[in-house]
């Protein structure tokens, strides 16, 4: 760390890192970054990769390729990347650092939602009828690292919807669990309730 500070003392990312999750858990600069004077070629992230707050993600002197480096400490996420529905990290369209700033940490629900909406702007609203889980946190319904369900849902319809909408005293108080639909087409909630992120119509109906 001391050797790094000889060049990076004024870098705000360094002081932020020491206060953030990686720093508090005992990681040092050299946990991810090798020597800047090593004979191996320097690997840079794409110059167009920026964090939402405007600070460029400069992956200089990394020991491994960017995403492989993340997965070396977070191996549980490697399996998520093999699931049928996932963000295209393996294809190189985005990277771990497109959503996660390695020098910061401790994301709140609000910052997680804003991070998702920076790409999915059409889901932002404001809406006349808010869907409570969406207003709280996108990950109430979505598993961003990979899922077996379409749309990166945590589980398939209608089970995801029914995890909240069963009894009147449940979290969101919409009693629909006893409703019976005979035709298979009506066994998907989104057949009628398509505007699940929010709506200007009644109860998130499609029309």
What is the role of each PLM region?
Residues 1-207:
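Short sequence/structural segments immediately N-terminal
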């Amino acid at each position: 760390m001391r050797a790094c500070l000889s060049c990076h003392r004024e870098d705000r990312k360094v002081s932020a890192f020491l206060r953030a999750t990686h720093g508090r858990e005992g990681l040092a600069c050299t946990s991810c970054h090798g020597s800047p004077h090593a004979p191996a070629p320097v690997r840079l992230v794409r110059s167009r990769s920026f964090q939402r707050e405007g600070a460029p993600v400069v992956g200089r002197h990394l020991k491994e390729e960017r995403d492989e480096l993340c997965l070396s400490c977070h191996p549980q996420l490697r399996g998520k990347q093999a699931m049928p529905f996932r963000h295209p990290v393996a294809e190189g369209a985005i990277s771990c650092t497109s959503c996660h700033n390695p020098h910061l940490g401790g994301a709140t629900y609000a910052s997680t939602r804003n991070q998702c909406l920076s790409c999915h702007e059409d889901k932002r609203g404001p809406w006349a009828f808010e869907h409570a889980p969406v207003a709280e946190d996108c990950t109430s319904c979505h598993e961003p690292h990979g899922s077996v369900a379409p749309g990166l849902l945590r589980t398939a319809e209608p089970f995801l919807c029914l995890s909240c909408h069963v009894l009147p005293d449940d979290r969101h108080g919409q009693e629909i669990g006893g409703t019976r639909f005979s035709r298979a087409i009506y066994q998907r909630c989104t057949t009628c309730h398509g505007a699940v992120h929010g709506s200007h119509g009644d109860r998130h109906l499609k029309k």
